């Protein structure tokens, strides 16, 4: 168990390709309005930032964090030779490798650096079904939780002696035996890790006490569960959740608004919870999506694009705009898309080196230019 308060990273994947232009809205730009006759947002719609850019109207809670200087907006984020396939683009973001197929994820490699001896099977926790590739790495255990309230291998076994006896039983059942092959031994190790992780995480729910009332939707529930684990102080450093789908080929005005309303409100509740528990400076949140959308609408939505926007939020974040806002001029477009102007791995490198205190080069494969959105000291 880890008693001291440590820095942690929460990664929220905006699955499907978030429309950057209707998130950070260039509402005074004529090209924006001309290109999006059906889905543009006007000056009276947006939450103004600086007289030319505005947040989507449903991002009110994020705007409050922005006003406290706790939101970094990473404009024009992407990678060389953009790929408009959901699967390939997400794979690139997950593995931090844009030129070849990498075997493991950037966060999986990060977990390996944090805990090379696998002493803590809950160093990283995914909230949701399955395991995102970003968290995958050989011999690295990661717990995956659907609902913390019902999570646990033995939720109905309450007595200490009973639980210890049950854990010993499962340990013998999953433990390695002489003469078994490597695959069975690996499965056994994963079984023991899952068993221990389930038992540790199940305790976080009972310890939680807060006056914050979260909404009842998947992203709010996930962030509430993340808060529970943070406050339990069990040594978890990496948290992962997903929100979507942002694949708004049709019905974008309604769907995009609903998604950002849910996420913005959930983040507002999450940071109020952190502040109530004195942890607002210990947690940094990354929001990312695999790509942006095309500059022109298609009638009621937008198709897959390239350059996008990411966000870094937290009490230790130096808020503001980072990366150049992509031009909408025809000569600056990439086949009808906004041009990317900063590599997403620069954001990863900043979070690794400046926030988690981990050398980013072994994880990302080389040096990347870094931002200054993490406060010093």
Regions found by a protein language model. Name each.
Residues 1-277, 296, 309, 313-377:
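Feature for exported/extracytoplasmic and membrane-associated proteins, marking the mature portion
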Residues 267, 271-299, 304:
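Metal-dependent active-site segment of extracytoplasmic phospho-/sulfohydrolases and closely related
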